[in-house]
Amino acid sequence: MQYQLLINGVLVDGEGERQSVYNPATGEVILEIAEASPAQVDAAVLAADSAFAEWGQTTPKARAECLLKLADSIEQNALEFARLESQNCGKPLHCVINDEIPAIVDVFRFFAGAARCLSGLAAGEYLEGHTSMIRRDPIGVVASIAPWNYPLMMAAWKLAPALAAGNCVVIKPSEITPLTALKLAALAKDIFPPGVLNVLFGRGQTVGDVLTGHEKVRMVSLTGSIATGEHILRHTAPAIKRTHMELGGKAPVIVFDDADLDAAAQGVRTFGFYNAGQDCTAACRIYAQRGIYDALVEKLGNAVSSLKMGAPEDESTELGPLSSLAHLKRVTAAVEEAKALSHIRVITGGSQTEGKGYYFAPTLLADAKQEDAIVQREVFGPVVSITVFDDEDQVLRWANDSRYGLASSVWTQDVGRAHRLSARLQYGCTWINTHFMLVSEMPHGGQKQSGYGKDMSLYGLEDYTLVRHIMVKH
């Protein structure tokens, strides 16, 4: 298929510099795509601003019908989407088909229903002779920046609530992994009125900055790194735009001596290495109580070393490559820094694999200390550290000693302990005896430098609205 931008309901070629898109499993170029020019970014935003006058006044039913049509279209083209995502990201094809595509379809269907349930919280006479009511209205033009780790899923998380609430959107996928977003554009063209949804392609410095800084953009939604979030906040601060930030994580996984160690080890094997560890909620920072530390290290070593790396199209592949050569170099540097510490033990993995593609072996680093960079910084790869702790107070202090605040988990059979820690952990989500589980009905989002705002759930829908007070004198 031809990959084009969607601007004002028309598929067009980019007018900017051409960029190569790679297959990370082979390191080979898939194709080249031209970026949007500044004039095309301007045209997309102006089209969205013009379309908002009508789209923002449509009924929730009408918006829901469009979202349902898009969900149906994605479902009908599931295999093509999955193949594109697998080819462009290196994800195991069966994971995209069985895990990601159904979740993406569900997000659009959830927000189609949620659009029809959005309402204000109060109506009444709070002043004699006056009736007050609360409205939740759309914001206007939303600029959405999607990341490279889950390109289509993160696009869905941003598009569905924004469109459901009555906003118009200009979305820019990562220049590393744009193919599924551009495929989505081709489907959306015949579903939404012109200008309601616009899809651009390009780098942050050439397209993203022009988009987020445009005077007609009222809100910017980003999933990305802390550095990118800081840049966008500085860039948009003079205009005081509404912002929604999901900026990564370093999830603590606290395993107490009464936990089911087999379940914990298998949980980390699955939840720490899914998508090659390129997940903001990955179970990557393990704390094990002293009494079970050695046993858990052994179980984790066996579990992690059994992960099968391979070609994305192979049904038995559990771990694919990292998304880019640049990211492979970042992960390698982080692990080499950890390995240089005399107290770190490499239980398994620890290096790039031989051969083509951007593969890094699943890695378990034992005896990490709280102050180590491998514990404090997000690696965003198939790398898990494990640290011993003595008691509840110590591990709570260590778990919260992080600039991140997205996700965490506690593994214990003590219900009281689970409740105590979940109440005090400074994370947007805490799982008990599991990790990584997300559903459309529940909010996902962080605190501290992991950002603010919620994806999914009714809270996510509300983030794309303005609360307004209307008062009538009578």
Curated annotation (Swiss-Prot):
NAD(+) binds at residues 146-148, 172-175, 209, 225-228, 280. GO terms for biological process: L-lysine catabolic process; putrescine catabolic process. The keyword Methyltransferase does not apply. Pfam families: Aldedh (PF00171). SUPFAM superfamilies: ALDH-like. The active site is at 246, 280 (nucleophile). It catalyses: 4-aminobutanal + NAD(+) + H2O = 4-aminobutanoate + NADH + 2 H(+); 5-aminopentanal + NAD(+) + H2O = 5-aminopentanoate + NADH + 2 H(+). InterPro entries: Ald_DH/histidinol_DH, Ald_DH_C, Ald_DH_CS_GLU, Ald_DH_N, Aldehyde_DH_dom, Aminobutyraldehyde_DH, PatD. The keyword NAD applies. Pathway: Amine and polyamine degradation; putrescine degradation; 4-aminobutanoate from 4-aminobutanal: step 1/1; Amino-acid degradation. One of its GO terms (molecular function) is NAD binding. Its EC number is 1.2.1.19, 1.2.1.-. Coiled coil: none annotated. It comes from the Bacteria. Keywords: NAD, Oxidoreductase. HAMAP family: Aldedh_Prr. Catalyzes the oxidation 4-aminobutanal (gamma-aminobutyraldehyde) to 4-aminobutanoate (gamma-aminobutyrate or GABA). This is the second step in one of two pathways for putrescine degradation, where putrescine is converted into 4-aminobutanoate via 4-aminobutanal. Also functions as a 5-aminopentanal dehydrogenase in a a L-lysine degradation pathway to succinate that proceeds via cadaverine, glutarate and L-2-hydroxyglutarate. 4-aminobutanal can spontaneously cyclize to 1-pyrroline, and 5-aminopentanal to 1-piperideine. Belongs to the aldehyde dehydrogenase family. Gamma-aminobutyraldehyde dehydrogenase subfamily. Homotetramer. This is Gamma-aminobutyraldehyde dehydrogenase.
